[in-house]
């Protein structure tokens, strides 16, 4: 709809005044600038990348990964770091829990020699480090593990039994207000790992679970991922890993509420090859007859673990199956598919 000359002149003058006061580009028409699709960092899980809708964690955004203990939250964060480092990105890990396992991180493919690590003494220090790294514009991905461990200084220095109502929530709210404006300019991605707590007095109405750190993080996040362990993987009598379900409960960059299931193997992390087999079966690329897995005329092995071992030892065959699976899913077309239909395969 055309604007009359007088209004147009007034608008142009207003834009010039705003640009002069706050800098060029402060106010613009969307049609004057070409916007590129949101770039993403792979999570290391094919299914979760699909569920997120853009092929991974969105760059330049705040993301929350939460769930019960030992559900795979830190593993997911470390796998994302490994993926980012392979793309030449600079990554940092703010270890507020002081529990980072360097050997495990190496096993997941993290370049620990070039990973920036901070183990802060209290919450304010952790968030100051986070803000400084973000403002520098030199760090692409920062993990904060975890929100629950961001204890305010006054609580640490106080006596046992002292009450500190809402201190951590106020701290998080202030930090997130400052961070949001910076992230857009520096394109830094921040992933907060969070724990869940039980609400008191829900009386059966609504979910009894909530996350720590107040409500601010829920609002400022572009993506929230709920990670749950749903089964234990066994080989004979030995436990070798967990089957995990990740549900995207909030997504500002794609449709939400999609979910994915994948295996996390003890000491190895997310089983990408296991996902290839699962998706291969769903897409009729890999055949499963009884306990036997095969690809065309090639026998992959009896049992999923043997099939995974065959593909691990034969990179050429693995790449061939991977190419066909990705082509069958096709990250443009498949991002709109129902994740519940393709997220889990026959065991």
UniProtKB/Swiss-Prot annotation:
One of its GO terms (biological process) is SOS response. The keyword ATP-binding applies. Keywords: ATP-binding, Cytoplasm, DNA damage, DNA recombination, DNA repair, DNA-binding, Nucleotide-binding, SOS response. CDD domains: RecA (cd00983). Pfam families: RecA, RecA_C. GO terms for molecular function: ATP binding; ATP hydrolysis activity; ATP-dependent DNA damage sensor activity; damaged DNA binding; single-stranded DNA binding. ATP binds at residues 67-74. GO terms for cellular component: cytosol. The keyword Nucleotidyltransferase does not apply. It is found in: Cytoplasm. PROSITE patterns: RECA_2, RECA_3. Belongs to the RecA family. Can catalyze the hydrolysis of ATP in the presence of single-stranded DNA, the ATP-dependent uptake of single-stranded DNA by duplex DNA, and the ATP-dependent hybridization of homologous single-stranded DNAs. It interacts with LexA causing its activation and leading to its autocatalytic cleavage. This is Protein RecA. It comes from Sulfurovum sp. (strain NBC37-1). The gene is recA.
